């Protein structure tokens, strides 16, 4: 079997896709004669969806040198009042015996050159060491988030309080290399509640990042603030010990030709052909990720703001969540689109706007000549897709580490405009604020400057993955460390 690199993905489609993209980049650069890729993944998580096996079959067929090994089904230990992340982290730990047996079996017929794990799979770190396999983390966020995560155990140590971050409304925290402080209430969602087991899990994960052989990051050096790269390289983020080597190898995003196979053909063609008829850089694209969702009241405010702005738009609307306070939905259930929007909105904006239900081919849409702006939930994959396409953003974070990303996109990278969210109302944004930010991005001089900056970054993103680019060089350095 030769040399193999084993990747271990956290549960959930997004984590598996990120690992696949890393595997594809390695094989694309070195060829299957140098390395094959094996991706380990779990079975039975509460975040699993029906699309995962379909995706894996497709990748197995189109990329034969990437193989998948699914673990036996494990039952979630679901307890009342325990959060989904805490249940998921416990589920991952229950899979440790399967990790051990997989590495043992693979090692019998091949040389495992590296074991690359997701941050949430930290319990597998000592298992890699058991087999004397160099073990690396794959960070699917940017360098600024990595800097924050490396420093988080220090903040935990220094925060002499029993209060949770979600309750520290007047407190801000500084991270090495960041230009502006972060509100305590905008910390990564996993650590907002000190009483949630996910809090101590996350601190544990972050404290183990420096104990790996290195960290691979899905970003490229030219995108990141120099102060952040210097803070990581200079050891400021891990003040009590050495920082392992860090390899920036992005932007790794899913290819258009693969995405298109999963699309609903008719609706996809409708929105793409509509975009082809619009003037250059005139359309605002609104899409909030695979799970981002709003209650009906917020959808109506967005609609009012779009209508008042007078701008062209393509808006992906998902079914409102069952719980009013939730900002996530799983799956793409059907719903009455007209029923969640203001009466007559679709008719009044039909000459300049298009609303699609649940899904649009985001990578393809962002690359259309007519798209001039992107309202995003600030998920890192979406950010990279916009950067590659050279499209400026309006940052509207919803959950996970997205508020942290917003800070960096607006203040440090200067590639987005932030919306003003009412924290006391669950992040509610008024229609007037939507109109204001849409006009600022699409009509103002500041928006034009942002667009020019993003266009240049798009060119840099392409260059980073080129033969002499920074990300290719960093991948070569990583491979040198394992061979």
From Swiss-Prot:
Catalytic activities: phloretin + UDP-alpha-D-glucose = phlorizin + UDP + H(+)
pH behavior: Optimum pH is 7.7.
Alphabetized UniProt keyword annotations: Glycosyltransferase, Transferase
Domain of life from the UniProt record: Eukaryota
Binding site for UDP-alpha-D-glucose: 140, 360, 362, 377, 380-382, 385, 401-402
Active site residues per record: 15, 118
InterPro entries cross-referenced by the UniProt entry: UDP-glycosyltransf_plant, UDP_glucos_trans, UDP_glycos_trans_CS
GO molecular function, one term: UDP-glucosyltransferase activity
Entry-linked Gene3D superfamilies: Glycogen Phosphorylase B (3.40.50.2000)
Thermal dependence of catalysis: Optimum temperature is 25 degrees Celsius.
Similarity-based family: Belongs to the UDP-glycosyltransferase family.
Protein name: Phloretin 2'-O-glucosyltransferase
């Amino acid at each position: 079997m030769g040399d193999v690199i084993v990747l271990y993905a956290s549960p959930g489609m997004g984590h598996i896709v990120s690992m696949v993209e890393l595997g594809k980049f390695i094989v694309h650069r070195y060829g299957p004669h140098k390395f094959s890729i094996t991706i380990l993944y779990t079975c039975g998580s509460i975040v699993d969806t029906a699309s995962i096996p379909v995706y894996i079959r497709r990748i197995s067929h189109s990329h034969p040198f990437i193989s998948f090994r699914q673990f036996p089904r494990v039952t979630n230990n679901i307890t009342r009042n325990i959060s989904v992340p805490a249940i998921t982290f416990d589920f991952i730990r229950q899979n440790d015996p399967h990790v051990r047996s997989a590495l043992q079996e693979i090692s019998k017929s091949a040389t495992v050159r590296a074991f690359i794990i997701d941050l949430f799979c930290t319990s597998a770190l000592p298992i890699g060491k058991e087999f004397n396999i160099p073990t690396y983390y794959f960070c699917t966020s940017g360098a600024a988030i990595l800097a924050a995560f490396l420093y988080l155990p220090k903040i935990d140590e220094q925060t002499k309080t029993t209060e949770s971050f979600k309750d520290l409304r007047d407190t801000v925290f500084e991270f090495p290399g960041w230009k502006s402080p972060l509100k305590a209430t905008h910390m990564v969602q996993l650590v907002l509640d000190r009483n949630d087991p996910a809090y101590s899990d996350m601190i544990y994960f972050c404290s183990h990042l420096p104990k790996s052989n290195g960290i691979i990051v899905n970003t490229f050096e030219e995108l990141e603030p120099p102060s952040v790269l210097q803070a990581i390289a200079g050891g400021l983020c891990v003040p009590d010990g050495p920082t392992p080597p860090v390899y920036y190898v992005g932007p790794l995003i899913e290819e258009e030709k693969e995405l298109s196979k999963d699309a609903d053909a008719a609706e996809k063609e409708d929105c793409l052909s509509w975009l082809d008829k619009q003037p250059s850089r005139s359309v605002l694209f609104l899409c909030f990720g695979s799970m981002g969702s709003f209650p009906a009241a917020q959808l109506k405010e967005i609609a009012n703001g779009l209508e008042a702005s007078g701008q062209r738009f393509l808006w992906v609307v998902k079914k409102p969540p069952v719980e009013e306070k939730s900002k996530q939905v799983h799956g793409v259930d059907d719903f009455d689109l007209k029923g969640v929007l203001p009466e007559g909105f679709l008719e009044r904006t039909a000459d300049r706007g298009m609303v699609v239900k649940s899904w649009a081919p985001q990578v393809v849409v962002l690359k259309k000549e007519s798209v001039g702006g992107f309202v995003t939930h600030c998920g890192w994959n979406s950010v990279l897709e916009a950067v590659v396409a050279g499209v400026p953003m309006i940052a509207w974070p919803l959950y996970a580490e997205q508020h942290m990303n917003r800070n960096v996109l607006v203040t440090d990278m200067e590639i987005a405009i932030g919306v003003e969210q009412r924290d006391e109302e669950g992040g509610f944004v008024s229609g007037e604020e939507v109109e204001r930010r849409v006009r600022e991005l699409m009509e103002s001089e500041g928006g034009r400057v942002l667009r020019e900056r993003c266009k240049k970054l798009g060119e840099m993103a392409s260059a980073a993955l080129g033969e002499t680019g920074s990300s290719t060089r960093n991948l070569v350095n990583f491979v040198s460390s394992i061979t």
